[in-house]
A protein has these predicted regions:
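Canonical Rossmann dinucleotide-binding motif of NAD(H)/NADP(H)-dependent dehydrogenases/reductases
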Residues: 2-36
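Catalytic loop of short-chain dehydrogenase/reductase
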Residues: 93-101, 106-110, 129-191, 201-216
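C-terminal helical subdomain
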Residues: 173, 199, 216-254, 258-268, ...
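The beta1-alpha1 cofactor-binding region of Rossmann-like NAD(H)/NADP(H)-dependent oxidoreductases
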Residues: 39, 61-76
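Rossmann-fold scaffold of SDR-type NAD(P)-dependent oxidoreductases
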Residues: 11, 83-93, 141-145, 198
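A short, exposed helix-loop element centered on a Lys and neighboring polar residues
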Residues: 121-122, 182
């Protein structure tokens, strides 16, 4: 597929902050690929985007992020349809209660929040590189959480597919997001591709995830899209990479994100798991 518009993919675009993220990207003239698990939810999300931006250019991409086979298939299909992807917004996330497992046998929270996004990025990074080299705009934006600061990476547990309580798994998954984003930034910088990779905390928001995981609400979800859209579009961060943002500003992240050795280990383990 060729388009004169820049193209953005938003995972988890049918719920929470995914919908306002898609709306704001469409408002800025992007062709927006909405990801979701079910066709009816994607249709509803598209109707919400079109209600806000009638001229929006929209496409659907369906996959259950708990299934690596579905993630890889979606990645291949999108890579076949698009020669360039200018913004890859890794937004989807879950807070699974108990010790739920994915169909692949991984801890569900780790599978969706970390492994799926690694696999999807691996499938599409060449298209982001094309956007960076051809159009000067190739960005990977990873939605983490302030919860990452209370996380700890258990490499042996990660090799085993996760072995934590529900909150520990969530906090670790959000720390893995930040470590992944920083390691991707190092790799793309070393290869001089022009691709940037940053992570962010969207805020404490009234999402289904917050209610499920923490039993409370928060600020309107529309506010949570602000930093994601900023990192995906703003000229002021065109060359910023490897940083963590809160409220559209660089903020301190967990020291693990600066540990290149740990980043390489996490990458290697995740690559092996995601290729099963």
């Amino acid at each position: 597929m060729t388009t004169t518009k820049k193209t953005a993919l938003v995972t988890g675009a049918t719920d929470g902050i995914g919908i306002p993220t898609a709306i704001e990207l469409a408002r800025r003239g992007f062709h927006v690929i909405l990801h979701g698990r079910r066709d009816e939810r994607l249709a509803k999300a598209e109707s919400l985007v079109r209600a806000a931006v009638p001229e929006a250019s929209i496409e659907h991409a369906r996959a259950d992020l708990s299934s690596l086979a579905e993630v890889r298939a979606m990645g291949r299909a999108l890579a076949d349809r698009h020669d360039a992807i200018h913004a890859l917004v890794l937004n989807a996330g879950v807070f699974a209660k108990g010790h739920d497992k994915s169909g692949d046998g991984f801890e569900l929270t780790i599978a969706v929040n970390h492994l799926a996004h690694f696999a999807l990025t691996s499938a599409l990074i060449d298209r982001v590189r094309v956007a960076a080299s051809r159009d000067g705009h190739g960005r990977v934006v990873t939605v983490s959480s302030v919860a990452h600061r209370s996380g700890a990476i258990d490499l042996e547990g990660l090799r085993a597919g996760g072995r934590h309580t529900d909150y520990e798994a969530y906090a670790e998954s959000k720390l893995l997001n930040v470590v992944f984003a920083a390691e991707l930034a190092r790799r793309e910088r070393a290869a001089n591709t022009g691709v940037t990779s940053n992570s962010l905390h969207p805020g404490v928001l009234a999402t289904k995830l917050l209610k499920t995981g923490f039993g409370r609400g928060g600020a309107p979800v529309e506010e949570g899209a602000t930093t994601s859209v900023f990192l995906a579009t703003d000229a002021s961060v065109a060359t910023t990479s490897g940083a963590y943002f809160v409220a559209s500003r660089v903020a301190p992240h967990h020291p693990s994100a600066d540990d290149a050795k740990l980043g390489a280990e996490v990458w290697s383990i995740t690559e092996a798991l995601a290729s099963r």
